[in-house]
């Protein structure tokens, strides 16, 4: 399978089950009763969150530059980076897949009939996304992004998809055990949990973690 660079039998069933097959006139990928995105898109949502008076953003700052004394000043640190990187790869690197995007402006109103089209056959790319569908924007031109799957190589590209199978999950569990020894550092996200989250599950994971911690760290006691 070109997205994963593996044979189907080498991929965990939970991953392959994420690709539904429908015989239907419904072109949507998901079948949830309620589906939505932020009214002005995710970029504006994140900008509004970061604009809060209690949030300070430090760019180009590696968490490793924080001293132990600085770390201890916080009731909780939520780490969304790669868990193997946090522990300096002491058990080895967790495998990932990466992506390369070609973003193009097309001189026509629409390029395709839906926001996302998957290409499982003999093309080098896997997905074409036409972004104007998300917010129902009107324009005589359109922008598409074409996704090309790649192997992840540390320092050369970005981690996108954890490759969940028995071998890799055993390696992740070694790092998970290390994380349990930390008093005030909590890991989540695709990289922190080494798990393939969609946006709804990523948000749900945050709420579950905060609910779990609300009586221990989010009180004035």
Residue locations for each model-derived region?
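Active-site/ligand-binding neighborhood in enzyme catalytic cores
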Residues: 1-76, 87
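A broad, structural surface signal
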Residues: 44-47, 51, 88, 204, ...
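C-terminal catalytic lobe of FAD-dependent flavoproteins
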Residues: 158-221
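Gly/Ser/Thr-rich helix-start
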Residues: 6, 82, 193
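Mid-domain catalytic core of redox enzymes
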Residues: 61-178
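Aromatic-acidic/polar surface patches that form glycan- and anion
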Residues: 35-42, 118, 195-202
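Hydrophobic, Leu/Ile/Phe/Ala-enriched alpha-helical segments that form helix-helix packing faces
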Residues: 49, 53, 135-138, 179, ...
């Amino acid at each position: 399978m070109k997205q994963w660079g593996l044979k189907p039998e080498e991929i965990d069933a939970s991953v392959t089950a994420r690709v539904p097959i429908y015989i239907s006139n419904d072109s949507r990928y998901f079948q949830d009763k309620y589906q939505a995105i932020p009214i002005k898109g995710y970029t504006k949502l994140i900008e509004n969150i970061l604009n809060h008076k209690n949030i300070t953003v430090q760019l180009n700052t590696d968490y490793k530059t924080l001293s132990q004394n600085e770390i201890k000043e916080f009731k909780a640190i939520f780490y969304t980076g790669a868990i193997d990187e946090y522990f300096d790869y002491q058990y080895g690197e967790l495998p990932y897949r990466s992506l390369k995007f070609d973003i193009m402006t097309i001189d026509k109103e629409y390029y395709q009939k839906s926001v996302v089209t998957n290409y499982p056959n003999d093309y080098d790319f896997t997905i074409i996304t036409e972004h104007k569908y998300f917010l129902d924007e009107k324009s005589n031109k359109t922008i598409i992004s074409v996704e090309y799957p790649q192997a992840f190589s540390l320092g050369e590209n970005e981690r996108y998809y954890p490759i969940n199978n028995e071998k890799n999950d055993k390696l992740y569990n070694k790092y998970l055990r290390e994380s349990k020894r930390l008093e005030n550092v909590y890991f989540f996200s695709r990289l922190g949990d080494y798990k393939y989250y969609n946006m709804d599950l990523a948000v749900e994971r945050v709420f579950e973690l905060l609910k779990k911690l609300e009586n221990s760290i989010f009180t004035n006691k």
